[in-house]
Amino acid sequence: MKLRVVWIGKTKESAIQTLTGEYLKRLSRYVATEGLEIGSEEALLKLKDRPGRTAPVLVLMDERGKQVGSEELANFLGYHRDQGVQDLIFAIGPSDGWQKETLKSATQVLSMGKMTLPHELARVVLLEQLYRGYTILTGHPYHGGH
């Protein structure tokens, strides 16, 4: 399986770039991982609908989505791994929210909670939670005590 974390827009803060790189590196110990900076929702839909490939599982992060805890996210990751999903995409959208067409194309819409976060910080939180999810699946002590 390949895990892709996609965000719209350029990264402005060097600290965010550093943390993004760190969590992508940590994730790569558990799953083939790629972080992608794209320019638009249309680019995300093109990535999702590439011809000749099995359709990926597309998870959109949105304030209106389903809220899940770390263990639930781990179960979600494990389920898709065990089902043989080849491409799992988590996407953080534009600041004005996802267009209806994009929301309709999603396999799942998840929320990181009711708090509003800057998109760059939301990316780091998502990457950390994905890393935590994989450590839960493998019994790594990272999650213990949290």
From Swiss-Prot:
The record's comment on protein family reads: Belongs to the RNA methyltransferase RlmH family.
In short, the EC number is: 2.1.1.177
- GO terms assigned for molecular function: rRNA (pseudouridine-N3-)-methyltransferase activity
| CDD domains from the UniProt entry | RlmH-like (cd18081)
Q: State the function annotated in the UniProt record.
A: Specifically methylates the pseudouridine at position 1915 (m3Psi1915) in 23S rRNA.
Q: Which cellular compartments is it found in?
A: Cytoplasm
**Oligomeric form and interacting partners:** Homodimer.
Protein source organism: Koribacter versatilis (strain Ellin345)
TM ranges are: none
> Which UniProt keywords are given for this protein, alphabetically ordered?
Cytoplasm, Methyltransferase, rRNA processing, S-adenosyl-L-methionine, Transferase
The record's annotation in HAMAP family points to: 23SrRNA_methyltr_H
Q: What is its main location?
A: cytoplasm
Q: Which reaction does it catalyse?
A: pseudouridine(1915) in 23S rRNA + S-adenosyl-L-methionine = N(3)-methylpseudouridine(1915) in 23S rRNA + S-adenosyl-L-homocysteine + H(+)
* Enzyme kind, highest EC tier: transferase
* Protein name per the record: Ribosomal RNA large subunit methyltransferase H
Recorded hits in Pfam families, A to Z, give:
SPOUT_MTase (PF02590)
Q: Name one GO cellular component term.
A: cytoplasm
Q: Where does S-adenosyl-L-methionine bind?
A: L60, G93, M112, G113, K114, M115, T116, L117
What is this protein's gene name? rlmH
